[in-house]
UniProtKB/Swiss-Prot annotation:
UniProt KW keywords: Host cytoplasm, Host Golgi apparatus, Host nucleus, Late protein, Virion
Species annotation: Infectious laryngotracheitis virus (strain Thorne V882)
Annotated family: Belongs to the herpesviridae UL24 family.
Residue numbers spanned by region Disordered: 1-33, 254-287
Protein purpose: May participate in nuclear egress of viral particles. Plays a role in the dispersal of several host nucleolar proteins including NCL/nucleolin and NPM1. Since deletion of host NCL/nucleolin negatively impact on nuclear egress, UL24 supposedly acts on this process through its effect on host nucleoli.
The organism's place on the tree of life at top rank: Viruses
Cellular localization per UniProt: Virion; Host cytoplasm; Host nucleus, Host nucleolus; Host Golgi apparatus
Signal sequence coordinates: none
Protein name: Protein UL24 homolog
A matching Pfam family: Herpes_UL24
Induction: Expressed late in the infection cycle.
């Protein structure tokens, strides 16, 4: 009897264990089924937000260079996005090997060239930037930007031109595409060949677009300035007239005026003038 009771107890314990195992397995499967759609939804929402940000940045740069808007998004991220007489090349999803930064902007002017690496972090809630998820995003974004700057330095062909690499971490709200924060992670200067550097990044990017700044029309102003300078130079080249020259000029002008006002008879010979001066009498006339 005792053995039978023990066997029954063992069977009950085994059945209880199997039931608990099945329940825990069911809960695990249910929790995984619940988590997977949420993770996928978050991932898809982040991808959609990235694509919307790319389109918004291109549209904002078009407003800056072509007019028709204030270009608030572009100026918020890159204050010097419209260089005088320069250009900016925007590249998205640049494959650097171990890292793939979201956006790289090449800003070229007459004096310098900048390579701005942008890592984008999308946020569902924009009330506070000190939450656990945002702090984690900031930490991972900082590591990604440092690796990207190191990979850019390794990929660049050495040259004589200096390129400043500026790393920016941008937090964007998924709703409204508002810029929550822009943080500068690091800044380095490398000596490269600018043409080969551009070709290397262009071949590794999925999408790029170039914006060129138009020169301001200063032709009329330059002409007037040139005319003023030429007039000044002409005044300096011609010496001031002396006193004798001024007197001679006045005398010649006075003589010209007198000759113009004299009658025609005044220019005759002396004999004719004498005959004209003497009175002519007619003998037949009755005085």
């Amino acid at each position: 009897m005792a053995r039978r009771r023990k066997e029954v107890q063992r069977g009950e314990s085994r059945s209880h264990r199997s039931r608990t195992r099945s329940k825990t397995a069911h809960h695990r499967k249910f929790s995984r089924r619940q988590l997977r759609p949420s993770l996928r939804a978050r991932l898809n929402a982040g991808i959609r937000c990235h694509n919307r940000f790319y389109r918004a940045l291109v549209r904002s740069l078009e407003e800056v260079f072509e007019g028709g808007g204030d270009g608030r998004l572009a100026y918020t991220i890159i204050p010097q996005c419209k260089p005088a007489g320069g250009k900016i090349v925007v590249m998205f999803e640049v494959n650097l090997g171990l890292r793939k930064p979201d956006c790289i902007c090449l800003l070229e002017t007459q004096h310098e060239m900048k390579c701005i690496v942008i890592e984008l972090k999308t946020c569902r809630f924009s009330k506070s930037l000190m939450t656990e998820s945002k702090l984690r995003q900031g930490y991972t974004g900082t590591l990604q930007l440092r690796d990207s700057a190191r990979l850019l330095e390794n990929l660049a062909v050495p040259g004589t031109e200096k390129v400043k690499i500026l790393s920016l971490l941008v937090f964007v709200a998924q709703r409204g595409m508002n810029i929550l924060a822009v943080k500068t992670v690091g800044e380095t200067v490398i000596n490269v060949s600018s043409e080969l550097f551009f070709v290397t990044l262009a071949t590794r990017s999925q999408y790029l677009k170039t914006f060129c700044a138009k020169l301001e029309p200063r032709v009329s102003h330059a002409r007037s300035k040139y005319q003023q300078e030429s007039a000044k130079n002409a005044d300096l080249a011609s010496p001031a007239p002396s006193a004798l020259q001024t007197v001679a000029a006045l005398f010649s002008s006075r003589v010209g005026k007198e000759s113009a006002t004299k009658p025609a008879s005044y220019s005759t010979s002396t004999e004719e003038s004498k005959n004209l001066s003497e009175p002519c009498f007619d003998p037949d006339s009755n005085l």
